[in-house]
Amino acid sequence: MEKDLRSRGGKRLSRRDFVKTVGLGSLALSGISFNPLKAWGADGKKFIWGGPSEFQSMDPHAIYDVTSENLRLNLYDHLYRYLDNPPKIQPWLAESYTVSGNELKWTFKLRKGAKFHNGDEVTADAVKYSMERLLALGKGSSALFKPVVDPEGVKALARYTVELNITAPSAPSLPLLPPFCIVNPKVLEGKPGPFGSEWLSQNDAGSGAYVLEKYSPGGGWTAKRFKDHWMAWQGNPVDEIEFRTIHETAARVMALQKGDIAACDGYLPVDQLEKLEKDPNVTVYDQQSMRVMVIRMHNQRPPFNDVHVRRAISYAFDYDSFINQILKGRVVRNYGPIPNNLWGAPADLKGYTYDLKKAEEELKKASVKIDRPLNIHPMTGYAQTDDAALIVQAGLRQLGVKVNILRETWPTLSGKAKDKENSPDMWIHWVSTYYADPENWIGEMYSSARHGAWKASAWYKNPQVDDLLKRARTISSMEERKKLYEQASRIVVDDAADIWIYNTKWYGPHRKNVKGVRFCPIG
């Protein structure tokens, strides 16, 4: 989500560089009217955001999750970015591009004069190095590019011209570019770790609107305004930003009400949202979004390796109670992995409902018996995941199955989810929009080629689905892609690969004096 931060040439430009809220977009400020509060500092020039998750690393090529978008959008620039709702892709460091007739060669023209934080100019060599670094490290968003980008195919043709050769046509090629951050190769020379990764995990080598000042893995980070950013500052800009980790929900809400922070995440329980909606000093924005809540199941670990067990667990979840009683109807039931307001999601998909009789029937069909307690992991600081875990526990208890609830932090769970042996039995999270294409959900979650990324932590493998998803990635006809994604969705749901609960609206709590909020569901 975004805030206007500055204007240029009389035309207001939306900056996605400033603050990331609720994991659904980022804030950039321009022309905000400042009423000094504690959250803004004494002179109204500091913005503080509070969220439940810790920051695992400051290296933009090592991380790829909702929390990390805060730093990726503020400290770094990209070739292209998404703006507004519905999201539209816009030129950023790249001013234009051309693509060859076979759609394998993409040539980008860079804007001149963009600077890194140390004063070096952003050039094609930096873009080339950044892609090579991302692919070599094999972390973060590298899973998006590895299937189609050969490191040898990235070429700096001229100071401001970079060529990207892909190995096969990829329908979402341009939409994939916003997660790709450009780093300064000169700053990383000689720094500890491969490609300076040890150093960059706690420092900054970007060209974004803000320069890192301080980082604490458990506490958050602060940054100062980069006065030489290519998008010239005007008006009354924010000089300092802080992203503060506050695990406890009640503590975040209290901090917002007291004015200690200016905004907080949107993963709040309904009772806390209602409290904030009644507060005369707080505005809670709500917007249609694309963010699916899902309970992951380890499809390759007994007893989850039996489809009938997975179906039984899917039938044992009380969706109606969770959505209409706990969340008071503020979200919309989503029967499959693709958000129901995005193309590729089958309109007639029914999915699973709460039905203990059907759950019992599925358990009788299972060849693998549940002979141990099952573990489910909600996320520390995300109260909705606690509620969902309790509903799983209550439903399975009626089937004679014991469930242990083991709460852990997002960095711990997403780290475990990358390894098949350490992946949880079940864990609960949201899949947000990193790019506006079905591939962001079903492709990254259920293609076996993605195994090893946290999004693919169901460890699901179905050759038919793999084939459908591969074809959907490599053809340009949206109508044909839509059919392939719909077919893949039906199979994945029939296989009960995970438990899909809802597609959400974005509820963004801000102090009343925060003006000009523009929401974008990407990130």
Per-range role (PLM):
Residues 1-17:
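N-terminal secretory signal peptides
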Residues 25-29, 34, 216, 220, ...:
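Detector for C-terminal structural segments
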Residues 50-101, 132, 205-207:
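N-terminal lobe/hinge region of extracytoplasmic solute-binding protein
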Residues 83-88, 178-236, 240, 248, ...:
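Gly/Pro-rich hinge or "lid" segments in bacterial periplasmic/extracellular proteins
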Residues 95-140, 157, 163-165, 255, ...:
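Aromatic- and charge-enriched surface segment that lines or borders ligand/interaction sites
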Residues 109, 143-189, 214:
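Surface-exposed binding/hinge segments that line
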Residues 123-132, 159-165, 208-209, 237-240, ...:
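Alpha-helical secondary-structure segments
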Residues 198, 228-274, 402:
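Ligand-site clamp/hinge motif
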